[in-house]
């Protein structure tokens, strides 16, 4: 017979492994600039961050903080970025506002503008003391143009074929600017060569360095180094230098060592195509982006329902869901209104998998913060959005929303049923029904709860507005719970408690 203590240990281990984190992205240097204004003093280093800022994140249910943009940058990228015009995103900007792309990394050491490696250790300790974790960037595709390795070991990079000197594609020394196959080259970075064995080792070691300071890594454009994608993007250059396709994927090669040393590391892949999402998950990523959900949320309730009802628990369990991040426009801008942005945020946060929030999302901001800048255009917080997220974040701390179980509700009825999105979330003794009116029209729908327990009358607790209703169990189970909502309104019902 299994020892009781061992059984409890195994059960807790399974519970911990199944729990999905609530991630909060912060653009580091703009946040320090924001805090300087908030507190009326210079806050430029990580150790200057007032500790109550970490307390605030913890109180609101954040479990992992992605500090975006902490690594050392090159001067080339900064000077390059200062040649651009940012008036469309920041009217009245000055050269002092330009801080350089955080993705033009020269070395995986702390950017001296924000501190030292010891400050990164301090940051992680502050989060750990509050039972939160730290995520940092790993940028596999490219480095700064003036990274030390560009001069010391150019074969680590994709190089121009002999006789090619296109200044839009290659540096003066013949190194390829980084690129995505669908866009023009990024001329502030140069492209690592993943078909060069030595490059693979260098980049595996860089990932190990990131994880020596963090509990997880967000891997920028992780799909670009897949052999199929990389080979197609750089076919001309690879053939010219006689490279052949590696026998395995870089991620498979790197994760063998990474996971042996850091078995609990959370690895998040930025990726967009469905086949790439599934492949990266199979190769060992903990989570992958689900950008398609955001695309659907910008549309109609039919598009959202059609997307989510075909997805499996497994898919929701290994994907990260968001309505904004540093790459995307603000949710309020994309959705067209504060109310639709809140509805979209509710869906993205309650479906399962990694819950992914962005700094400023809770404030209902409309203006995007450009990654090259230390500040965005000034705007006021939306009080209603802030209060709504304060309530939602408390709800999301329930195990039902960080667990794995998800059930789409198919058979709704009522005059506005086609405008409603509904699904069940549960974990152990926690049971919830999420209902969102994803339209501008008020209306009602009957939403069946197939697994509601008991007979007779049952108390159903709507937790967003903290209201209890007494309803007949048989009616709820067979005909549905009647839910009437204003346009873009969400309600979350707790039952079986």
Where are these regions (language model features)?
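Positively charged n-region of N-terminal signal peptides that target proteins for export
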Residues: 1-5
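Sec-dependent N-terminal signal peptides
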Residues: 6-13
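Active-site and adjacent substrate-binding regions of carbohydrate-active enzymes
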Residues: 17-497
């Amino acid at each position: 017979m299994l020892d009781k203590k061992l059984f409890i240990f195994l059960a807790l281990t399974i519970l911990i492994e199944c729990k999905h984190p609530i991630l909060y992205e912060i653009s580091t240097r703009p946040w320090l600039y924001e805090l300087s204004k908030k507190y009326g003093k210079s806050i430029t280093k990580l150790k200057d961050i007032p500790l109550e800022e970490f307390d605030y994140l913890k109180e609101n249910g954040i479990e992992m903080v992605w500090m975006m943009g902490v690594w050392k940058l090159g001067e080339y990228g900064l000077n390059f970025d200062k040649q651009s015009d940012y008036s469309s995103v920041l009217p009245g900007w000055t050269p002092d506002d330009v801080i350089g792309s955080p993705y033009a990394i020269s070395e995986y050491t702390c950017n001296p503008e924000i501190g030292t490696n010891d400050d990164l250790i301090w940051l992680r300790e502050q989060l750990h003391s509050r039972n939160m974790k730290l995520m940092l960037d790993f940028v596999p595709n490219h480095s700064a143009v003036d990274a030390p390795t560009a001069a010391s070991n150019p074969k680590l990079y994709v190089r121009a074929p002999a006789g090619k000197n296109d200044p839009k594609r290659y540096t003066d020394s013949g190194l390829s600017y980084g690129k995505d196959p669908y866009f023009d080259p990024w001329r502030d970075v140069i492209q690592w060569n993943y078909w060069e064995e030595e490059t693979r080792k260098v980049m595996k070691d860089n990932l190990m360095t990131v994880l020596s300071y963090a509990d997880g890594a967000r891997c920028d454009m992780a799909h670009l180094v897949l052999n199929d994608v990389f080979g197609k993007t750089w076919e001309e250059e690879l053939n010219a230098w006689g490279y052949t396709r590696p026998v395995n994927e870089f991620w498979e090669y790197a994760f063998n060592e990474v996971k042996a040393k850091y078995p609990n590391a959370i690895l998040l892949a930025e990726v967009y195509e469905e086949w790439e999402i599934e492949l990266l998950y199979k190769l060992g990523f903990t989570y992958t982006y689900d950008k398609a959900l955001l695309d659907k949320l910008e549309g109609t309730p039919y598009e959202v329902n059609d997307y989510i009802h075909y997805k499996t628990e497994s898919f929701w369990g290994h994907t990260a869901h968001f309505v904004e991040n540093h790459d995307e426009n603000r949710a309020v801008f994309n959705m067209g209104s504060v109310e639709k942005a809140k509805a979209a945020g509710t869906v993205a946060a309650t479906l399962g998998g990694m819950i992914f929030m962005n700094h400023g999302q809770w404030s209902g901001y409309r203006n995007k913060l450009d990654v090259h800048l230390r500040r965005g255009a000034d705007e006021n917080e939306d009080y209603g959005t802030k209060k709504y997220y304060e309530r939602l974040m408390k709800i999301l701390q329930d195990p039902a929303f960080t667990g794995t179980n998800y059930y789409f509700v198919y058979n709704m009825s009522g005059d506005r049923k086609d405008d409603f999105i509904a699904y069940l979330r549960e974990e152990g003794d926690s049971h919830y029904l999420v209902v969102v009116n994803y339209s501008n029209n008020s209306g009602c729908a009957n939403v069946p709860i197939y697994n509601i327990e008991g007979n007779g009358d049952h108390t159903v607790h709507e937790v967003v507005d903290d209201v209890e209703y007494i309803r007949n169990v048989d009616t709820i189970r067979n005909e549905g719970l009647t839910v009437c909502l204003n346009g873009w309104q969400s309600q979350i019902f707790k039952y079986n408690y």
